[in-house]
């Protein structure tokens, strides 16, 4: 009866509440009172009513704020829905399936659908990296020094000290890098809040607290809780005095949240210590008072002591022990999440499902059975895969205790070791990128020879009197504003050849090391800088024109990325002359959304010229969720093929596209001739690096041309394999499975034959095969400038020791098959 009277009192005070909401509110008030009473002795609360009033006042303030946020998010959702409905009506019915998936990832090749979550997140990420670089330089630390400092795992301790007590590390570089990290995060935080998040600023925050799910899971809840408890600031973490038993119970809940918490479409609260995630999947609406009450009982936050060592010690034991890696991953995940919110509102997956339903309804209402059939469950499944890819969830590995945990990680380790062994010659193979860059630049209007020269000049560094490389001074400022030439900060360089696969952990550091010592980081950044600045200069030279007066080729390219006449006016207003040439300083544009859109255009174009796999090619190359035998076998088969897939989808497709009607033959001729020229150059340098004589063109014209096209075109690393499969005689005992299956699968087949060799007492061949496999998985074994010396001083001697007479047989075989 007393409860009913209380409910009636609540209803009288707030007549708009239902009985259920009144009961929830009453339960919350009772919980507040009980909590204060239970801690009365410790808190020395003499005025219980005053304490209750204060707690309720704080609760009401939180509720009002949440209601305001929900109202704002509802308005954002309305705007997003309206924009989609308008676009759906304007899009021809046959184009609807393409248009819908292009919201997630723009189409490759010649297409009008390029603006997407992916292009937006790339633009955001490039802007965040530019903020980081420029803030470091303003603080007196050159970017190459700062990046090197960040990439050194041991320097994480100094960064933690700077966060806890600025200046305490007594390391000027650490101080500058920490401030730059905070500035980059702050830019992304503001953009996230603009589009539906509610992330508070914390001064000094450089990276969210990380938790290695596997490490935490391996420790019992009790062990983890007792290990972390001495490291915590108990006042900030628990909010009120608690007994040790209560603290351990609280931490046990946190342990469960970390180990079993389901990864969903989220924007992570990037408070350094906050575990809370804002659910982007739930539909908008007021959550009611009980939801906030439940939030009070959740595992909310862990605050470490600001002593310069507690957070560091926790990361070494249970978190990401590489602060630099955690920071770059955070920039990437935040850019992905904000990009998703900008296109789909605060609840991206919910909104995407709604868009899919509306598109299918239109097809059904118009009785278009063909389009309705295309929008089937298989289409929906692929769309969901694309969504996972562009929101950073596409390569999530199974957790400890889940099926496929060891299989997926073993697969990653094998691929990374293989990559670290093979990619030592990437810098030479990437000479072919000059050709693709020239083709793309020429396609939008840059004269063909000028396009080739501008990219070639980009490889002549300023240090030797050129105007290329990553650039410095004003030229570098322009490149930063365009969002190009900064991939080396992250794993973006190796992702050109690995997709987004196997980039973190399981030997990935070996791949990063190879990219660095071979100069591939520098070459990639230099080429993208050259492409971006060539494009900017070409457009800036036409700044006196109206958008409608631009050549059709460049205008349609810009329109595909969502660039409007208003955006073009903004670009014309920030034209700046550097070294006698006109460029755009995009960072001078006040409209941040326009700046992101324009950055997405420049970075997208650079990624299509210096081929970088995107979400579509990654989904094609990966296909399935990780951890199953089928998915891992497919992953191994597609290992190092993502570059070739991207070439086919981005470059080769332009020679067959209906959108290129009337220009397809000319495009194919340019692709073939350019591939042949730069492929011949790459294969010749590769032969010299191996200690071989260049192939005699007059005696092997057909083979040289075929080999050159394979090397300069999209075959990339697999140019050697295709040449081996079609142009050369395979090794004794090897078939198509070993050659075409890829490096890792080929090695598995080779090792699988060793027991048979031993059984047949062919010991020399068994030893030689085992040695060959081991060498092919040795990181750094193929570094181009050391290859000749390593072969003659080490590898050939080892092979000769295992198989006497091998060197002479090998030399005869190579000369017979290749004439070299």
Where are these regions (language model features)?
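N-terminal leader/propeptide segments of preproteins
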Residues: 243-344, 556-559, 566-567
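Short linear, low-complexity motifs centered on an aromatic residue
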Residues: 195-210, 445-459, 654-662, 760-769
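Low-complexity, small/polar and acidic-rich linker and loop segments
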Residues: 2-187, 201-203, 208, 213-215
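Hydrophobic alpha-helical segments
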Residues: 757-820
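Small-residue (glycine/alanine-rich) low-complexity segments and short Gly/Pro motifs
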Residues: 656-775
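Hydrophobic, often aromatic-rich secondary-structure segments at membrane interfaces
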Residues: 305-428, 432-705, 709
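Short linear interaction motifs
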Residues: 166-169, 184, 199, 268-275, ...
């Amino acid at each position: 009866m007393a409860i009913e009277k209380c409910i009636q009192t609540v209803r009288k005070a707030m007549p708009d509440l239902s009985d259920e909401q009144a009961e929830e509110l009453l339960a919350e008030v009772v919980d507040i009172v009980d909590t204060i009473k239970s801690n009365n002795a410790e808190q020395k609360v003499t005025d219980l009513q005053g304490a209750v009033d204060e707690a309720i006042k704080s609760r009401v303030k939180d509720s009002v704020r949440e209601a305001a946020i929900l109202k704002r998010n509802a308005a954002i959702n309305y705007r997003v829905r309206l924009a989609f409905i308008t676009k759906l009506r304007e899009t021809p019915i046959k184009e609807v399936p393409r248009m819908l998936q292009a919201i997630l990832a723009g189409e490759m090749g010649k297409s009008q659908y390029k603006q997407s979550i992916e292009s937006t997140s790339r633009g955001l990420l490039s802007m965040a990296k530019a903020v980081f670089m420029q803030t470091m330089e303003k603080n007196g630390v050159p970017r190459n020094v700062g990046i090197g400092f960040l990439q050194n795992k041991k320097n994480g301790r100094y960064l933690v000290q700077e966060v806890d007590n600025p200046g305490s590390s007594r390391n000027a570089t650490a101080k500058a890098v920490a401030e730059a990290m905070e500035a980059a995060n702050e830019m992304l935080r503001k953009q996230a809040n603009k589009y539906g998040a509610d992330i508070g600023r914390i001064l000094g925050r450089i990276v969210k607290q990380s938790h290695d799910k596997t490490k935490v899971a391996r420790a019992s809840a009790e062990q983890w809780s007792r290990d972390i408890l001495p490291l915590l600031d108990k006042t900030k973490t628990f909010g009120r005095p608690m007994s040790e038993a209560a603290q351990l119970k609280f931490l046990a809940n946190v342990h469960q949240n970390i180990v079993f918490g389901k990864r969903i479409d989220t924007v992570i609260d990037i408070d350094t210590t906050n575990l809370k995630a804002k659910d982007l999947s739930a539909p908008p609406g007021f959550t009611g008072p009980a939801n906030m009450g439940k939030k009070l009982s959740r595992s909310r936050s862990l605050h470490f002591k600001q002593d310069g060592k507690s957070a560091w010690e926790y990361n070494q034991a249970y978190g990401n022990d590489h602060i630099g890696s955690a920071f770059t991953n955070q920039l990437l995940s935040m850019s992905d999440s904000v990009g998703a919110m900008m296109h789909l509102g605060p609840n991206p997956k919910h909104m995407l499902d709604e868009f899919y339903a509306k598109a299918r309804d239109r097809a059904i209402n118009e009785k278009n059975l063909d389009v309705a059939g295309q929008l089937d469950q298989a289409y929906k499944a692929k769309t969901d895969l694309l969504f996972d890819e562009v929101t950073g969830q596409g390569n999530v590995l199974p957790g400890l205790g889940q099926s496929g945990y060891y299989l997926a990680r073993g697969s990653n380790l094998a691929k990374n070791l293989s990559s670290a062994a093979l990619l030592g010659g990437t810098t030479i193979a990437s000479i072919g990128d000059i050709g693709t860059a020239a083709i793309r630049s020429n396609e939008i209007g840059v004269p063909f020879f000028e396009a080739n020269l501008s990219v070639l000049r980009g490889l002549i560094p300023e240090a030797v009197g050129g105007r290329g490389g990553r650039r410095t001074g004003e030229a570098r400022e322009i490149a930063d504003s365009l969002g190009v030439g900064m991939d080396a900060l992250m794993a973006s360089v190796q992702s050109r050849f690995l997709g987004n696969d196997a980039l973190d952990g399981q030997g990935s550091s070996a791949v990063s090391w190879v990219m660095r010592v071979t100069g591939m980081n520098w070459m990639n950044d230099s080429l993208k800088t050259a492409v971006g600045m060539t494009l900017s200069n070409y457009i800036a030279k036409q700044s006196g024109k109206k958008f409608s007066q631009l050549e059709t080729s460049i205008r349609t390219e810009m329109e595909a990325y969502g660039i409007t006449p208003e955006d073009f006016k903004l670009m014309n207003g920030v034209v700046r002359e550097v070294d006698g040439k006109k460029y755009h300083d995009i960072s001078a544009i006040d409209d941040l959304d326009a700046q992101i859109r324009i950055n997405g255009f420049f970075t997208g174009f650079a990624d299509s010229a210096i081929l970088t796999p995107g979400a579509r090619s990654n989904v094609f190359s990966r296909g399935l969720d990780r951890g199953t035998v089928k998915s891992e076998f497919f992953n191994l088969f597609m290992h190092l093929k993502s570059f070739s897939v991207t070439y086919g989808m981005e470059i080769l497709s332009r020679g067959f596209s209906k959108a290129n009607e009337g220009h397809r033959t000319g495009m194919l001729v340019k692709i073939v001739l350019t591939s042949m020229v730069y492929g011949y150059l790459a294969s010749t340098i590769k032969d010299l690096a191996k200690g071989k004589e260049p192939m005699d063109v007059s005696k092997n014209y057909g083979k040289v041309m075929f080999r050159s096209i394979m090397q300069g075109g999209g075959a990339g690393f697999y140019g050697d394999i295709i040449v081996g499969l079609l142009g050369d005689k395979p090794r004794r005992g090897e078939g198509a499975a070993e050659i075409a299956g890829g490096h890792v699968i080929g090695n598995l087949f080779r090792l699988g034959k060793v027991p048979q060799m031993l059984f047949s007492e062919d010991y020399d061949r068994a030893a030689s095969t085992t040695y060959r496999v081991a060498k092919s998985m040795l990181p750094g074994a193929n570094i181009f400038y050391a290859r000749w010396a390593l072969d003659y001083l080490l590898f050939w001697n080892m092979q000769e020791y295992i198989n006497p007479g091998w060197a002479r047989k090998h030399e005869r075989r190579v000369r017979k098959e290749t004439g070299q």
